[in-house]
Amino acid sequence: MRYDILIIGGGPIGLGFARMMAPTGCKIGIVEKQPAEKLAAAPDDGREVAVTHRTHGLMERYGLLPHIPEKEIHILREAEVINQGSPSSLHFSPEDSDKENIGYVISNYHLRRAAYKAIQDCDNIDLIEGTVSALDLGRDEATVTLATGKKLSAKLVAAADSRFSTLRDMAGIKTDKLDFKRLCIVCRIEHDKSHRNIASECFLNGLTLASIPLADYTSSLVLTMPQDKGEDVLALGDDALAEKVNAWTEKRLGRVKIAGKRHAYPLVGVYAQSFSAARFALLGDAAVGMHPVSAHGFNFGMYGAQTLAEIVTGAMLNGLDIGSPLLLQNYTNRHRATTRPLYEGTNAIARLYTNDRPLAKLVRKGILTAGKMLTPARKVLVKTLTQEDKAS
């Protein structure tokens, strides 16, 4: 079976890229190991996604947003960073922009369901259930072999198969990996004080605690800690964990109770050394797997999908080869310029704030104090969060 574009991975970025390319009329195949019914009813995995204004605009433009219940799109009005034992904190507010908020929060499973629904009316998109066993990047076309032995070919293969991408390995693209040797634990909590739509990131001794505002009096709790301590937390009963959270938060949200199942994820940062090869491109976490402290992974995935869609669409309109190495190198260059500074900055901050040596603690306090005074830098970051889709 021949396609113009083959996308490996039916997550929101892979499906989103397919939806962006659908108006060109090109023939698109999406290979996904899960059956369609599981994509349509993606389960709650506990993860909440911070969505920038630009990403929100892309979701609206390409038909994802209408498939998400309005009550499940939560306002992110402000964000604050707190360091235990420091009187200083760092605030990010819409006062530094022309918006009423700095973004939105949407559950990952709603994004997955919406992306699946957004492609249902696209006659030029095929969803193929299967697992890739081999990849051949030829001069004139790429060939993907499925575990069943079935072969699919395309002018371009785009891999959106997670930060642990097997397609990336098959293409021979190396990565810079940073294993934080930590566990990220997420669950919903209820509390008797309003969160006021403010996200909070608090760095404590030995762990990081974030609360992400959802419906009022409900938040998503995100804990990152060493693997062994994380296993201990997972073994606690709900009441015992709630008491620990009350102590860690100093009851800033009032009394807290655990209101959902706990989910745990290993914490690994990944940055591909190239985002492309001949007839091949990386999307989403397969290209850039961010530390969750950045809250920017999904946004970077959508930005990358938009960039690649613009480049490939332009090539089609001009009769150019969409799998050309030079063409795809343009995608690598543009997406690297968008992602590299925040990726490196986030990792540096994460390393600093998970280091409990006295010198590191002193530096942390100094950064928060300086950050309060560096108003121009803070405004630049808020502007990045609140910028809109340039084509919307």
Kindly give the residue locations of the regions a language model identified.
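Conserved FAD-binding catalytic core of PHBH/FMO-like flavoproteins
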Residues: 59, 143, 157-254, 260-262
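FAD/FMN-dependent oxidoreductases across multiple families
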Residues: 231, 235-323
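Generic enzyme active-site microenvironment
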Residues: 30-31, 159, 283, 290
